């Protein structure tokens, strides 16, 4: 699409040049790059989520605590506690079936098309071609494109949102929070999740312009937030990832999906260097 051409020819080049000038671009690696990637991703993700969803009061994502940790990591990097090793308990992306072959085909095709062109430019005819069915078959199940998109969101978002929330809930009581976050990021940024990452990103972008989509996704986000919030109460007082930083970590993960578009090399980062640790916490609380 034209948008992707502009990203590749202009935006990606400019961002990579800027990062290279700071010594943290695609041609470099290490703790500094990891910290900058984390900081940029957090800002990108928080900006998008806060603009797409109807957050009010303390429900808005405040990335201050995470940004403090990432800034400290640049000046006082902490080596990973474990050596490189194969990812444990890696789970590839699982497409949730509806047990209806035609519906599954249409939702899978919608995910594919939306991930590549966005919701507003995804056409019923293109989705039908991808699914291998006629346009009439779509209108036999759905009133219009909006109802197909709504069903697609309803099938795909809740199970993945639940899994994400459950994964992050484990972080709060983990003896080594950094190791758990490392596994989460390594799994999420794996090739298996690439299409889901793009689909999720395009859906949230569409929510900025569609009240119906925003309302639907906000409901899923609220459920995930409550799960994470309950789990965060069990975090030790001195833990680097507590209520504030744990909730705002949702923005970091989404932001990686944004940064990945302009710098695909971040998918190969050594996530053991993710800047999380007690050394970056002040007075027992992330500031």
Regions found by a protein language model. Name each.
Residues 7-30, 219-226:
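Extended intrinsically disordered, low-complexity coil regions enriched in Ser, Thr, Gly, Ala
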Residues 39, 164-197:
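Hydrophobic alpha-helical connector segments
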Residues 1-2, 39-40, 149, 160, ...:
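Short, structured motif recognition centered on aromatic/hydrophobic residues
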């Amino acid at each position: 699409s034209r948008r992707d051409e502009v990203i590749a020819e202009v935006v990606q080049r400019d961002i990579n040049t800027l990062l290279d000038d700071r010594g943290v671009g695609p041609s470099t690696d290490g703790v500094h790059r990891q910290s900058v990637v984390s900081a940029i991703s957090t800002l990108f993700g928080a900006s998008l989520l806060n603009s797409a969803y109807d957050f009010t009061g303390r429900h808005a994502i405040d990335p201050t605590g995470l940004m403090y940790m990432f800034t400290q990591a640049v000046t006082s990097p902490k080596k990973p506690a474990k050596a490189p090793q194969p990812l444990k308990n890696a789970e590839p992306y699982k497409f949730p079936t509806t047990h209806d072959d035609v519906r599954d085909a249409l939702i899978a095709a919608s995910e594919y098309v939306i991930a590549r062109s966005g919701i507003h430019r995804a056409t019923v005819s293109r989705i039908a071609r991808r699914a291998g069915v006629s346009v009439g078959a779509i209108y036999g199940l759905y009133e219009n494109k909006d109802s197909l998109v709504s069903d697609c969101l309803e099938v795909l978002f809740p199970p993945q949102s639940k899994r994400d929330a459950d994964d992050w809930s484990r972080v709060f009581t983990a003896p080594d929070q950094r190791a758990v976050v490392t596994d989460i990021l390594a799994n999420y940024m794996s090739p298996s999740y690439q299409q889901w990452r793009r689909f999720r990103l395009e859906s949230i972008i569409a929510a900025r312009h569609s009240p119906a989509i925003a309302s639907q996704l906000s409901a899923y986000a609220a459920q995930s937030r409550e799960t994470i919030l309950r789990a965060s109460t069990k975090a030790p007082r001195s833990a680097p990832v507590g209520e504030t930083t744990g909730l705002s970590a949702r923005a970091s993960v989404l932001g990686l999906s944004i940064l990945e578009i302009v710098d695909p090399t971040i998918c190969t980062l050594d996530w053991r260097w993710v800047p999380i640790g007690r050394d970056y916490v002040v007075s027992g609380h992330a500031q």
